Amino acid sequence: MAVPIALTIAGSDSGGGAGIQADLRTFAFHQVHGTCAITCVTAQNTLGVTRVDAIAPAGVAAQLDAVLSDLPPQALKTGMLLNAEIMEVVAGTIAPLFIPRIIDPVMVSRTGAVLIDQAAIAVLRDHLLPLATVLTPNRYEAQLLAGMDIQDAADLDRAARIIRDLGPQAVLIKGGAATGDWHGVDWWWDGQQSHILKTEAIATPHTHGSGCTLAAAIAANAALGLEILAAAQAAKHYVTKALRHSLAIGQGQGPLGHFYPLF
C-alpha cells in the first residue's frame, strides 16, 4: 500500500500543542506519514515559552539529508526556523524539490511580538518566500512583509498582492488575529483569483498551534493529491473542526483537538 509522505521542518513544543507535534498529528489524521527535521527545542506549556534552544545548522541539514535520501515527501511545510543560518540550510535543501512547499513564516506571534531578528527576516524574505507554493502569514506577519497596516478587506487584498510579488505562488493571510467581521476569515491570492476562506467562527481560548495546524493540513492534503487551493480549503475546514473540539488542558491556552473524532 502506497502511503503519502509529508515533511515538516519546524520546532519542537514540549507541551505538545504546536510545532512538529501539531504537524505530525495533523499528518496522521489525514492518513499521511509524517517525517520531520527539528530546528529548535522549546521548553513550553499552555502558559508560555520559557526557553528556546536552536539545533545546529549542520544538525538540521543531517536530518533533512536522512529523510530525503530514504523517505521523499510528496509535500512539505516549514514552521519556526529561528535564525538566518537554519533558514539558509532549509532554503538550499528544499529549492530543488518540485513538490508543494507550504511556508508558514513564523516571524510574529498572534499577539504581535516579533520572534526572529532582522537577519533572519531578510533571509526569509529573499530566499524562502520565492520557494513557497503557499505562504501562510498571520495578520501581523502580513503587515510586516507588506509594509502596511491591515484593517479591512481592501487592505487584505492589497497586502496579499504585495506579498505575492515577493515570490510565493499563492498567499493565504490568516485572520485568526483579526477582530470584528474578519476574525477567523482567511484571504487567498494566487495571482489570478482571490478567495475568502470562511467557516464558522469558533469561540474558544484554546487555539494554541492553529497556524501550524493549518499549514500542515494544507501540506497533508497536497500530499494526498489535492490541487493547492482545494488543499487550503479542506485544511480550513479541518482546523475549524479541530478548534470546535479544542482541548481545555493545562492552566492556559490549550491545543486543538487534532483527533477530534476520537476525543
Swiss-Prot record:
It catalyses: 4-amino-5-hydroxymethyl-2-methylpyrimidine + ATP = 4-amino-2-methyl-5-(phosphooxymethyl)pyrimidine + ADP + H(+); 4-amino-2-methyl-5-(phosphooxymethyl)pyrimidine + ATP = 4-amino-2-methyl-5-(diphosphooxymethyl)pyrimidine + ADP. Pathway: Cofactor biosynthesis; thiamine diphosphate biosynthesis; 4-amino-2-methyl-5-diphosphomethylpyrimidine from 5-amino-1-(5-phospho-D-ribosyl)imidazole: step 2/3; Cofactor biosynthesis; thiamine diphosphate biosynthesis; 4-amino-2-methyl-5-diphosphomethylpyrimidine from 5-amino-1-(5-phospho-D-ribosyl)imidazole: step 3/3. InterPro entries: HMP/HMP-P_kinase_dom (IPR004399), PM/HMP-P_kinase-1 (IPR013749), Ribokinase-like (IPR029056). Its EC number is 2.7.1.49, 2.7.4.7. SUPFAM superfamilies: Ribokinase-like. It is an enzyme of class 2 (transferase). One of its GO terms (cellular component) is cytosol. 4-amino-5-hydroxymethyl-2-methylpyrimidine binds at Q44. One of its GO terms (biological process) is thiamine diphosphate biosynthetic process. Keywords: ATP-binding, Kinase, Nucleotide-binding, Thiamine biosynthesis, Transferase. GO terms for molecular function: ATP binding; hydroxymethylpyrimidine kinase activity; phosphomethylpyrimidine kinase activity. Transmembrane segments: none annotated. Belongs to the ThiD family. Catalyzes the phosphorylation of hydroxymethylpyrimidine phosphate (HMP-P) to HMP-PP, and of HMP to HMP-P. PANTHER family: HYDROXYMETHYLPYRIMIDINE_PHOSPHOMETHYLPYRIMIDINE KINASE THI20-RELATED (PTHR20858:SF17), PHOSPHOMETHYLPYRIMIDINE KINASE (PTHR20858). This is Hydroxymethylpyrimidine/phosphomethylpyrimidine kinase. The gene is thiD.
